[in-house]
């Protein structure tokens, strides 16, 4: 057992590990009372995610409470946008709002290349502090939004139910959309490299809205740009594991496994055993407990974790939810999730 390298990093690299590492998407956030108390004093989401002291404190809250195997930067997938010349705000309960949606060739051509060390030095500072604080007790995770999902936000101007505006662009002016996606791919790759240089040991790309695409449109508008990000990052950081997450990905799991990422994060609508059959042996999995299960009983949570871990046995696996933890989740149930993940070997013995 290698005590000097965090468990999650060893697992993500495909090394033999004593148990699957466990962390949780959105593990820092509204379900935690300490977060809500801090939010009362700092109501602006952008302040909480862009002030290095606040971002660091929030990132550390779940680590102090539950000691997960991964500590993820508290930030937002839209945080790099101002560095490219796109202003946005995040309104509580409404989500992100883009002040001037991108819908013309001139707007795309006017976008600036992202220079994260200048426009986002706070991210580098937080990642460095996290590495210092957690040492080898946990891996530090960075993350970004994938090009399609960023484009969906900046073209629509806000969250959308049917993505009519960006789909109209995709099917009326595909070249315009491809230029925007290409700009985002290059900028996001640059941003990920900056996160890795600053201390991130594993990185995750969220293509949250790619599940809204048909498989053939995923092949045109999402996958090539996911691949471009992966290729550009791997050129500089070949040993940094990369994870890809898509919400509603059941129709494109095989395609996700062909993007070059090391790990595919499955949502909870796919049975773990089925998901693994659809991925190459070399590609690992993350997930995929239903976040709604954390409103259930402790026994239900433990039982599902045993089921997921059993099905993933023999493959590279990081235990996680199939989506971010939901607001209103009892904090005690988050604790049950983490403790069950850490004690899963004993739970499997008892249940067999």
From Swiss-Prot:
<keyword id="KW-0456">Lyase</keyword>
<dbReference type="InterPro" id="IPR000257">
    <property type="entry name" value="Uroporphyrinogen_deCOase"/>
</dbReference>
<feature type="binding site">
    <location>
        <position position="208"/>
    </location>
    <ligand>
        <name>substrate</name>
    </ligand>
</feature>
<feature type="site" description="Transition state stabilizer">
    <location>
        <position position="76"/>
    </location>
</feature>
<feature type="binding site">
    <location>
        <position position="323"/>
    </location>
    <ligand>
        <name>substrate</name>
    </ligand>
</feature>
<dbReference type="GO" id="GO:0004853">
    <property type="term" value="F:uroporphyrinogen decarboxylase activity"/>
</dbReference>
<comment type="function">
    <text>Catalyzes the decarboxylation of four acetate groups of uroporphyrinogen-III to yield coproporphyrinogen-III.</text>
</comment>
<comment type="similarity">
    <text>Belongs to the uroporphyrinogen decarboxylase family.</text>
</comment>
<comment type="subunit">
    <text>Homodimer.</text>
</comment>
<dbReference type="GO" id="GO:0006782">
    <property type="term" value="P:protoporphyrinogen IX biosynthetic process"/>
</dbReference>
<comment type="pathway">
    <text>Porphyrin-containing compound metabolism; protoporphyrin-IX biosynthesis; coproporphyrinogen-III from 5-aminolevulinate: step 4/4.</text>
</comment>
<feature type="binding site">
    <location>
        <begin position="26"/>
        <end position="30"/>
    </location>
    <ligand>
        <name>substrate</name>
    </ligand>
</feature>
<keyword id="KW-0627">Porphyrin biosynthesis</keyword>
<keyword id="KW-0210">Decarboxylase</keyword>
<dbReference type="InterPro" id="IPR038071">
    <property type="entry name" value="UROD/MetE-like_sf"/>
</dbReference>
<dbReference type="Pfam" id="PF01208">
    <property type="entry name" value="URO-D"/>
</dbReference>
<protein>
    <recommendedName>
        <fullName>Uroporphyrinogen decarboxylase</fullName>
        <ecNumber>4.1.1.37</ecNumber>
    </recommendedName>
</protein>
<feature type="binding site">
    <location>
        <position position="153"/>
    </location>
    <ligand>
        <name>substrate</name>
    </ligand>
</feature>
<keyword id="KW-0963">Cytoplasm</keyword>
<feature type="binding site">
    <location>
        <position position="76"/>
    </location>
    <ligand>
        <name>substrate</name>
    </ligand>
</feature>
<dbReference type="InterPro" id="IPR006361">
    <property type="entry name" value="Uroporphyrinogen_deCO2ase_HemE"/>
</dbReference>
<dbReference type="GO" id="GO:0005737">
    <property type="term" value="C:cytoplasm"/>
</dbReference>
